Amino acid sequence: MNPHTNLNNVFDFPDLPMLLPKSEALSVTTDFSVPPVQQGAQQFHPPRNLGPQLARRWSCGDSQHADEPPASYYHNLGVALHNHFQMSNQHYLSDFDCPTTVSPISSAHETGQLPQLSPYDHIGNQDPHMFSPHAYGNSMIPDNSYFENASRSISAPNVGNSTLNPSLMSSDNAQSCGGRRRFRTNFTELQSTFLEDSFKESHYPDHKAKKYMADFLKIPEDRITVWFQNRRAKWRRKEHRQRDRTRNESFSGGSNSFDFACFSAQHPDDGPNAKHPNSFGIPNQPMSLDQFPMNTEQDFPEFPSLQEHQ
């Protein structure tokens, strides 16, 4: 027996008889006569079983037909492609521990009959750097470096992988994660005192004054500009609060000093004819109309006319 014979392929055993179904093995007799074949017409030849011949030529090392693979090649190739398509769906789950799919026929990879498959064969002629591995499954998220864009997006966390990616922790990414990063300057006591004194002199220093303060305090000029902006905002808030507090105090003080005695109700014991001593010592007596005589004829004093003055 040939040592290269594949036991899984029946075509590598040409000595075994090819069993045909009984319906095909029985000879059928026909009563009608077959018409003669016309000269020049295309004749139909039934296909022959070339499996044993191809297998024999492949196993015997016939150089003339060496480019004709056996039938086991196509079987192994189909199984390998099926496994490859299953693994391509899990290719981007690089952060998870995915079990690799093993081919049921081990001779497919050991004998070297299958070509080496690239992990990007299922993508086509696209750039392999277009899609980056993502931690949340086969979502096929495009990488920003493929589009040659200066802006970078926030990278997803590494799920299932305890080791951090050092490229994600770079200073470039740390500054771009939050968009525009805000820097906070810590001023010393001397610098704060100097700036407060300058603010008392002028709330809006000019460019020359800010440049002098920057050179004296060893602080960038833009930091001094930001400090004055924040200080003016703080001063305005303080002024608004003080103005509101003063308005509230004046309103509450005026309402407490107001005398509501004039609006007090009359005492129930006081009758309409009650007599109360007043501050002048004159007793209150009921008045009658006879005490006020009505004079119908009154003598008005004569005022000098304008002609006398003239």
UniProtKB/Swiss-Prot annotation:
CDD domains for this protein: homeodomain (cd00086)
Role: Transcriptional regulator which plays a role in the expulsion step of defecation by controlling enteric muscle-specific expression of exp-1 which is required for enteric muscle contraction. Not required for exp-1 expression in the PDA neuron. Also involved in controlling the length of the defecation cycle.
Principal subcellular localisation of the protein: nucleus
Expression by tissue: Expressed in the bilateral sensory neurons AWA, AWB, AWC, ASE, FLP and PVD. Also expressed in the enteric intestinal and anal depressor muscles.
Compartments where located: Nucleus; Cell projection, Axon; Cytoplasm
Keywords, ordered alphabetically: Cell projection, Cytoplasm, Differentiation, DNA-binding, Homeobox, Nucleus, Transcription, Transcription regulation
DNA-binding region, residue range(s): 180-239
GO biological process, one term: cell differentiation
Organism name: Caenorhabditis elegans
InterPro entries: HD (IPR001356), Homeobox_CS (IPR017970), Homeodomain-like_sf (IPR009057), Paired_Homeobox_TFs (IPR050649)
Location of region: Disordered: 262-310
Protein name from the UniProt record: Homeobox protein dsc-1
Pfam families reported for this sequence: Homeodomain
Molecular function GO labels: DNA-binding transcription factor activity, RNA polymerase II-specific; RNA polymerase II transcription regulatory region sequence-specific DNA binding
Claim: Transcription regulation is one of the keywords in the record: yes
UniProt GO cellular component terms: axon; cell projection; cytoplasm; nucleus
UniProt feature, compositional bias: Polar residues: 281-298
Classification via SMART domains: HOX
Presence of the UniProt keyword DNA-binding in the record: yes
Disruption phenotype: Shortened defecation cycle length with change in periodicity of the cycle. Expulsion defective with distended gut and lack of enteric muscle contractions due to lack of exp-1 expression.
